[in-house]
Amino acid sequence: MKIEKNTVASLAYQLTIEDGVVVDQSTVDAPLDYLHGHNNLITGLERELEGKVAGDKFTVTIAPEDAYGEHNEDLVQRVPADVFQGVDELEVGMRFLADTDQGPIPVEITEVDGDEVVVDGNHMLAGQSLTFTVEVVAVRAATEDEIAHGHIHQAGGCGHDHDHDHDHEGGCCGGEGHGHDHHGHGKKEGGCCGGGGCGSH
């Protein structure tokens, strides 16, 4: 079976960024599963997977415009530290959900300067070319429920879980890893495929 819309593919992959650092991976024994054709992957990778079959192996470099976009300086802002209510000590690397006119977006603290904090709303891989080494482990037809919900229904795959205490903003895949932000929602903004799900951007 070929990878096409409404199929579920299982992938073993390694993701490296421009300096050669490995930022995410999954193995043949614990592959990443995702529903194809439902925006569960970054555009460039999903396009490369179209038509592949189990056993296919390839390496591809995805440009920023087909991954997480270029780094947008408009998403870097200096804000008063007191907007972070209920946090005893602000530190570089902390992540939060910020309420915006476009809805909540994840931001990361990149600088703490006295009573002011610099936050960055860019994805951590924005502006990066991403190189994937991929093996297609398996391909199957999606179930009706999976197609209706737009994601797979098994542990370890890409998509949303249904407990709404979590926010998903993963790397390549939706983000099934859960860190903690300070608004009561777990989130991961990981590499391409956070904790078992390669995902939407």
Swiss-Prot record:
Top EC class, one word: isomerase
Keyword Isomerase: yes
EC numbers: 5.2.1.8
Gene3D superfamilies from the UniProt entry: 2.40.10.330, 3.10.50.40
Reaction(s) this enzyme catalyzes, per UniProt: [protein]-peptidylproline (omega=180) = [protein]-peptidylproline (omega=0)
Region annotated IF-chaperone, chain positions: 76-120
InterPro entries: PPIase_dom_sf, PPIase_FKBP_dom, SlpA/SlyD-like_ins_sf
Residue numbers spanned by region PPIase second part: 129-151
Compartment annotation: Cytoplasm
Region (PPIase first part): 1-69
SUPFAM superfamilies to which the protein is assigned, alphabetical: FKBP-like
Single GO BP term: protein refolding
Residues the record lists as binding Ni(2+): C172, C173, C192, C198
Keywords from the named record: Chaperone, Cytoplasm, Isomerase, Metal-binding, Nickel, Rotamase
GO cellular component terms listed in the entry, alphabetical order: cytosol
Residue ranges occupied by any PPIase FKBP-type domain in the UniProt entry: 6-95
GO molecular function, a single term: peptidyl-prolyl cis-trans isomerase activity
Family per similarity comment: Belongs to the FKBP-type PPIase family.
Function in brief: Folding helper with both chaperone and peptidyl-prolyl cis-trans isomerase (PPIase) activities. Chaperone activity prevents aggregation of unfolded or partially folded proteins and promotes their correct folding. PPIases catalyze the cis-trans isomerization of Xaa-Pro bonds of peptides, which accelerates slow steps of protein folding and thus shortens the lifetime of intermediates. Both strategies lower the concentration of intermediates and increase the productivity and yield of the folding reaction. Also involved in hydrogenase metallocenter assembly, probably by participating in the nickel insertion step. This function in hydrogenase biosynthesis requires chaperone activity and the presence of the metal-binding domain, but not PPIase activity.
Domain notes: The N-terminal region consists of two globular folded domains that contain prolyl isomerase and chaperone activities.
Protein name: FKBP-type peptidyl-prolyl cis-trans isomerase SlyD
Organism in which the protein naturally occurs: Vibrio cholerae serotype O1 (strain ATCC 39315 / El Tor Inaba N16961)
